[in-house]
């Protein structure tokens, strides 16, 4: 042992005495023992190559923590044997520890058991998988994104394959999958080399990757996705940049004649982009890897070659025997040809590769049993220490086993062949079954990706059920979502069965806890798309914020209304806490109005029910309102309701039945007040804040309707109650919140309450005093100014929208969309939505709708705010006005009680009393899914609408000032009217809205005169509109709810007689006459 003495001699120089093939220079490199009967050569070869891979060795060294499985812990066994490689003075080391760990890990699959020969390639792959589960136990091997996972950060190739027909252009759906070894048939490789030579091309090492790609797709033809008859090759695209690429060579025979040809054609450099049809990672596009290791098979035995980096020598490992071959690759080729070694695995590594990041790695060793128990105690399959994206269904303890059960049973198909072939039958059958197994494993990987997609769809419906069940416990639900979802990219809420949605994200983000880095990279659009996956696909407008859908408290990582609310909460007492509006979502099912009524009553006292005033400004900032009908076909619940409406379009005629119950439901102003706030929250909870974007118009159900002159008609259909009930109560609420602190405002509110009481008691008083109107106007103006100072475009009262009207809003939107088409007005839908939502609130406060708008001190404030909301130029205002007016006419006529509050806010601040018809019907209950839209059959019937459209166009040239200062006949009526009167109502509203387009005058006379100016267009409606304040108004608080009513509700209320007040018959009767 002279070399040992020399090695121990101080100052000994190995380089001077190096002899190729001698043992002297190999002293630092250890062999692995393989005692008779152990048959561990397949394992020894894999371990030796892993040790020689600098990237793997350094990565394993820096990882200090892992989940340990005791005797079955391959991670511990590798750590131990690597430490022995580094520090032991023994020439050969036993590999018993890792062999026992491998056998214990796969005892259920009966793989790699003691004393049995097995396949080195499969051993290598399975060891990588085991290493993954020790480092990142909570992640599926196909979905791992941990930066500390050696397996996926260094070895895994993330691919997708797709077929594209060059003949017809059809393409198949891309199938993503992950693989650790790219298998190539040696026969196909040699054939490709021969074809290249036939083309008189000289084989170059840089062409090796292209040859491998060609061999990989040889004879791999698929049918055209469109069945055009063409046979096309599969395309495989690499999406990441692995630092170690493993090529597996599949032999058709143990004694193949191609051995020498294959060995000679192997290249020591691999150009990564040439190996695939395309690479998407920028680093991969220029990645060139070097051959650093090779495992060979010969005569039922495995051996390995590895490139020793420090000495730049090729080393040969044959169990305990370690020999240095030389510095040149030719020496290895000669050895292989001479000994008839068949290359089995080729390891190409990035020479500049580095160790994995420990940023998200475990810091200590944790026993598997402890880890499993803690995970089970958490009850939500959440990783204890490690952050994870995707968790398996049955918890952490079973995840590794699930992966094994998923993948390894396929290995059993060929394991028996492989076992006996190693013992004497030959390598050919094993290799043939091996490539079959590779394909099966690849298929399994694809199935995993498909299952993940299916799981998303499943969870989308499960999420609805979960949220519906947890509606009463939103606070606790939010905490659970915070904890459970902060680790998931997909951001799906926890499903009842413990499934987590894989891959999207994006509106359910971690709340208050912050998302992890791999979570933060998820695009917002992807997040919002996932959340809305339950309904039809939609493209969110750039400025659109998703509220009520995003289950967030502070909107971390998302620019949502909820996050805006949290920022504006200090500025506006009326800002709604949309961050808490997470419980209610419209379900894609037959809607039960009764259940919704009881639901709204339960929510009356919820602290989360605050007026919402921020939804409109947020949504209004998007300039592309004209495209919104296309971009936002579904606003969460909109499409669900819209679908029901489409199904029941024919039944939209019976609008009377909803009123009967409504008259009984609303008992007083207090109830209306509670409902106003309550509905507001329900609407925000259901995510309807963004429904303003549904149509091309910029208005929201809450948003005030701009009548012809730009005066805002607050058609808040919050509740089919006394005209002023909701607005007054809202004003009262706002006042209580500090929006209006002046005593004068308090007096105004008190006056309103008294008026409402009188109205509800018997509607004895048939007209409001001008003083009352002025007070209301002043109060609302003040309130609006407060909101304006707070940066809000509209007071909260005008934005308080009941859930009922959310539904109605969406239903109405759909119908209004139909209705607006004849008029070529893209804003009508949006305005109608607003009207439909507001019509329930007969009380029309121009200023409350948009107090700042009515104030003529801000000449263009109305339009400026409205245009800001709409994101439109002032020139488009007439369209908005037109639609608004149409809406108003429709709703005003549809509403039996017409409360016309005319107060023109002039630049001098003088408010002129408006015409006010005061016969108010009793408060009505919330019609959650009432449809106030006009049937399609009626959209063509309202010819005055077209005429009014022309009038609006004519008036569209009015200056902004005139628009903002013009008096608005805010004809506020209960939104529910008989279907018969929809057309007339619409016309009336158009006529009424048109009057503001006439010379800006806020006086009643001017209003009447303006109404008269429109007489040519709507004669019958004009009569009713121009009625004096003392004239009675008929109560017609009916609206079309057929499309959203359940059969039970329809049967119960359909036969209820219409409510009518003799004295109030004037308005609607005149309109009908």
From Swiss-Prot:
Changing residue 31 to S: In PFIC7; likely pathogenic; strongly decreased ability to catalyze deubiquitination. The active site is at 41 (nucleophile), 301 (proton acceptor). This is Ubiquitin carboxyl-terminal hydrolase 53. It holds the Pfam family UCH. The keyword Secreted does not apply. It catalyses: Thiol-dependent hydrolysis of ester, thioester, amide, peptide and isopeptide bonds formed by the C-terminal Gly of ubiquitin (a 76-residue protein attached to proteins as an intracellular targeting signal). Residues 391-437, 485-636 are annotated as: Disordered. The lineage of its organism: Eukaryota, Metazoa, Chordata, Craniata, Vertebrata. Interacts (via the C-terminal region) with the heterodimer TJP1:TJP2. Zn(2+) 2 binds at residues 132, 144, 149, 152. Deubiquitinase that mediates 'Lys-63'-linked deubiquitination of tight junction proteins, such as MARVELD2 and LSR, and which is involved in the survival of auditory hair cells and hearing. Specifically cleaves 'Lys-63'-linked polyubiquitin chains composed of at least 3 ubiquitin molecules, while it is not able to deubiquitinate substrates with shorter ubiquitin chains: recognizes ubiquitin chain in position S2 and catalyzes en bloc cleavage of polyubiquitin chains from substrate proteins. Zn(2+) 3 binds at residues 165, 168, 224, 228. The gene is USP53. CDD domains: Peptidase_C19 (cd02257).
């Amino acid at each position: 042992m002279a070399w040992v003495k020399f090695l121990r001699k101080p100052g000994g120089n190995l380089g001077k005495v190096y002899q190729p093939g001698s043992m002297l220079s190999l002293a630092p490199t250890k062999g692995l023992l393989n005692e008779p009967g152990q048959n561990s050569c397949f394992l020894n070869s894999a371990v030796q190559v892993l040790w020689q891979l600098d990237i793997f060795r350094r990565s394993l060294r820096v990882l200090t923590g892992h989940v340990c499985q005791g005797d079955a812990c391959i991670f511990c066994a590798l750590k131990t044997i690597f430490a022995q490689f580094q520090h032991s003075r023994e020439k050969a080391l036993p590999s018993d520890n890792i062999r026992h760990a491998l056998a214990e890990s796969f005892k259920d699959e009966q793989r790699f058991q003691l004393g049995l020969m097995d396949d080195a390639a499969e051993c290598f792959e399975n060891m990588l998988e085991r290493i993954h589960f020790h480092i990142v136990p909570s992640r599926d091997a196909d979905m791992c994104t941990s930066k500390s996972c050696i397996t996926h950060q260094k070895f895994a190739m993330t691919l997708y394959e797709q077929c594209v027909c060059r003949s017809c252009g059809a393409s198949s759906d891309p199938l993503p999958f992950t693989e650790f070894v790219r298998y190539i048939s040696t026969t196909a490789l040699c054939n490709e080399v021969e074809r290249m030579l036939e083309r008189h091309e000289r084989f170059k090492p840089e062409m090796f990757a292209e040859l491998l790609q060609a061999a990989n797709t040889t004879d791999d033809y698929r049918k055209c996705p469109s069945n055009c008859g063409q046979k096309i090759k599969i395309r495989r695209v690499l999406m990441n940049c692995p630092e170690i690429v493993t090529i597996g060579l599949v032999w058709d025979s143990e004694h193949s004649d191609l051995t020498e040809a294959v060995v000679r054609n192997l290249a020591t450099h691999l150009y990564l982009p040439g190996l695939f049809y395309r690479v998407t990672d920028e680093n991969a596009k220029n990645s060139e890897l070097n051959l650093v290791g090779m495992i060979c098979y010969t005569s039922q035995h495995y051996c390995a070659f590895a490139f020793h980096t420090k000495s730049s020598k090729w080393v040969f490992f044959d169990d305990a025997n370690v020999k240095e071959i030389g510095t040149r690759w030719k020496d290895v080729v000669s050895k292989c040809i001479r000994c008839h070694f068949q290359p089995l695995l080729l390891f190409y590594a990035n020479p500049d590769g580095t160790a994995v990041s420990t940023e998200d790695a475990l810091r200590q060793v944790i026993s598997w049993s402890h880890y499993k128990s803690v995970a089970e105690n958490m009850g939500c399959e959440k990783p204890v220490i490690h952050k994870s994206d995707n968790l398996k269904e049955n918890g952490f303890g079973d995840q590794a086993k699930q992966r094994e059960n998923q993948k390894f049973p396929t290995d059993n198909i060929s394991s028996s062949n492989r076992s006996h072939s190693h013992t004497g039958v030959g390598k050919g059958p094993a290799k043939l079954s091996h490539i079959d197994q590779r394909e099966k494993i690849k298929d399994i990987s694809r199935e995993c990706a498909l299952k993940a997609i299916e799981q998303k769809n499943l969870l989308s419906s499960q999420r609805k059920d979960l949220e519906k069940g947890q509606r009463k416990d939103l606070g606790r639900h939010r905490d659970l979502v915070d904890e459970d979802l902060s680790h998931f990219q997909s951001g799906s809420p926890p499903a009842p069965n413990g499934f987590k949605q894989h891959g999207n994200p994006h509106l359910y983000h971690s709340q208050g806890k912050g998302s992890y880095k791999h979570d933060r990279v998820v695009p917002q659009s992807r997040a919002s798309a996932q959340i809305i996956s339950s309904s039809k696909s939609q493209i969110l407008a750039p400025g659109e914020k998703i509220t009520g859908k995003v289950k967030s408290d502070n909107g971390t990582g998302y620019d949502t209304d909820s996050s805006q609310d949290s920022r504006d909460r200090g500025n506006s007492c009326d800002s709604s806490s949309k961050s808490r509006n997470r419980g209610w979502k419209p379900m894609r099912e037959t809607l039960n109005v009764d259940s919704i009524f009881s639901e709204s009553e339960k929510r009356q006292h919820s602290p989360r029910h605050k007026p919402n005033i921020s939804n409109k400004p947020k949504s209004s900032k998007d300039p592309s309102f004209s495209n919104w009908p296309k971009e936002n076909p579904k606003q969460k619940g909109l499409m669900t309701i819209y679908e029901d409406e489409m199904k029941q379009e024919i039944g939209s005629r019976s609008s009377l039945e909803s009123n009967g119950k409504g008259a009984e439901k609303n008992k007083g102003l207090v109830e209306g007040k509670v409902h106003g706030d309550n509905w507001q929250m329900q609407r925000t909870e259901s995510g309807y804040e963004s429904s303003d974007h549904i149509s091309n118009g910029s208005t929201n159900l809450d948003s005030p309707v701009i009548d012809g002159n730009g005066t805002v008609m607050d058609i808040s259909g919050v509740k089919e109650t006394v005209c002023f009930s909701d607005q007054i109560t809202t004003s009262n609420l706002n006042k209580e919140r500090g929006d209006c602190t002046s005593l004068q405002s308090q007096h105004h509110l008190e006056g309103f309450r008294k008026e409402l009481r009188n109205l509800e008691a018997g509607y004895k008083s048939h007209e409001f005093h001008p003083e009352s109107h002025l007070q209301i106007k002043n109060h609302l103006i003040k309130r609006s100014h407060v909101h304006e100072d707070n940066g809000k475009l509209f007071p909260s009262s005008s934005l308080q929208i009941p859930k009922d009207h959310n539904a109605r809003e969406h239903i109405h939107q759909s119908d209004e969309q139909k209705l607006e088409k004849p008029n070529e007005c893209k804003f009508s839908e949006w305005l109608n939505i607003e009207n439909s939502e507001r019509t329930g609130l007969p009380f029309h406060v121009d200023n409350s709708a948009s107090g700042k708008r009515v104030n003529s001190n801000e000449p263009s404030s109305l339009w400026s705010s409205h245009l800001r909301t709409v994101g439109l130029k002032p020139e488009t205002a007439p369209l908005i006005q037109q639609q608004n007016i149409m809406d108003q006419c429709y709703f005003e006529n549809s509403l039996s009680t017409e409360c016309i509050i005319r107060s023109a806010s002039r630049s001098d601040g003088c408010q002129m009393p408006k015409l006010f018809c005061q016969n108010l019907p009793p408060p009505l209950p919330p019609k959650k899914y009432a449809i106030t839209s006009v049937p399609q059959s009626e959209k063509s019937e309202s010819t005055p609408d077209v005429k009014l459209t022309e009038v609006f166009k004519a008036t569209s040239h009015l200056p902004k000032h005139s628009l903002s200062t013009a008096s608005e006949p805010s004809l506020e009526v209960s939104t529910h009217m008989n279907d018969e009167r929809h057309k007339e109502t619409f016309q009336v509203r158009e006529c009424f809205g048109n009057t503001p387009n006439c010379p800006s005058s806020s006086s009643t006379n001017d209003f009447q005169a303006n109404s008269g100016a429109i007489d040519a267009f709507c004669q019958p409606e004009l009569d009713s509109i121009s009625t004096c304040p003392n004239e009675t108004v008929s109560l017609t608080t009916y609206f079309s709810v057929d499309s959203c009513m359940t059969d039970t509700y329809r049967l119960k209320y359909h036969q209820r007689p219409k409510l009518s007040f003799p004295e109030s018959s004037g308005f609607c009767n005149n309109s009908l006459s």
